[in-house]
Amino acid sequence: MRKYQHLLFSLLSIAFLASCGKSYKDQQRLNREQQIEAARQDSAALKIATVPTMDCLPLFIAAEDSLFQKAGVDVRLKRFGSQTDGDTLLRSKNAEGIVTDLVKAEHLRHQGIALKFVTSTNASWQLISNRIARVAELKQLSDKMVAIAPYSATQMLADMAIDSARTKEKVYRIEINDVNVRLKMILNNEIDAAILPEPQATQARLFQNPVLMDSRDKNLHLGVIAFRQEVMENKDRKQQIKKFLQVYDATVDSINKHGVKHYGKIIRKYMGVDMHTVNALPTMTYHHTTSPRQRDIARGARFTP
C-alpha cells in the first residue's frame, strides 16, 4: 500500500512540476511579446528630447494633461538633465526631435545630423556669479571659473561676456553639461559663475547671486525645437509633427492666458524647483510656432568654440 502511495505522490509531483514549467515558459513568452509590442509602440511614437527648463514648459503641460493623446498623436518626452544626453539619443536615431539651441544645432550639423527647425522658443540665459566670489561685474571674472555646457548657447554667451570684459587674467570655462549641477555648484560655492536658463536662474537669484549678463538684453533668440531632416521627409512623421505643433500652439495660448505660475505643480515636477522659485519667476510670454530669425541662425552658425 505504501508503495502505491509513494508512486502516486511521485506522479503528482511530476505533474505539478511540469505545469509549473509550462506556466513559467508561458510567462516568459508573454513577457517577450509585451516587450516586442512596447518596443514597436515606442518606435512608432514621436520621441522628443527635453531638458528641465522653461522653454520646454508647453511640452511638459501637453504631456501631463494628455493633450497629445487627445489630439491623436503619441508623443513621448525623453527627459534629460543636459542637452548632451539628448544629442546622443538623436545621434542614435532613438529620438526624432529635440529642444535645443542654434549653437548646439550647428554643432550637430557638423557631426552629420541634419536638422529642421519647426519653431523658435523663448529660451533665455543669464550669467550669474556666486555672491561669495564677490564678482559684481564682468571685469571681475579675471582668473575665475565659469560653468558652461560646451558647444551650446551657454558657451557662446560666456565668450561674449568674457570678450567684452577684457579681463587682465584668463577666465576658465568649466564644462558642466547638466543644468541642475551648474545651479548646485553656484549654490554650494563650488564655482565662481555659471550660465543658467530659467527656472534655474531664478533660484540662483533668490540666494542673492548677482546677474552679470542677460541674453535678452543682447537681442538673441537662440532657442529652437528641431527634428531630424529625414524624419521631416517621412509622410507619417510629418502628420505626427503637424499634430504636435497644433497642440503646442494651443498650450502656448493657455500659458499666456493663465501665466506660468498657474502651472506651478508641473514646473515643480518636471524641473525640480520649489514653489518659492515658481512664485519668483519673471513674467514670460510664449509664442506660436514660428521659424527662428535668419540673423539668429547665422549667429549660431558663425560661433566657433
Residue ranges and their predicted role:
Residues 25-34, 38-46, 193, 262-305:
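An extracytoplasmic/periplasmic, membrane-proximal ligand-sensing/linker region
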Residues 1-8:
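Bacterial N-terminal signal peptides that target proteins for export
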Residues 17-19:
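C-terminal motif of bacterial Sec signal peptides marking the signal peptidase cleavage site
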Residues 102-104, 173-174, 178-267:
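Pocket-lining segment of extracytoplasmic ligand-binding domains
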Residues 22-29, 153-173, 246-280:
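Ligand-binding clefts/hinges and TM-proximal coupling segments of bilobed small-molecule sensing domains
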Residues 56-59, 155, 241, 264, ...:
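A general structural signal for well-ordered alpha-helical segments in protein cores
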Residues 23-176, 185, 192-198, 210-219:
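Short, glycine-/small- and polar/acidic-enriched structural segments
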Residues 10-13:
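Classical Sec-dependent N-terminal signal peptides that target proteins to the secretory pathway
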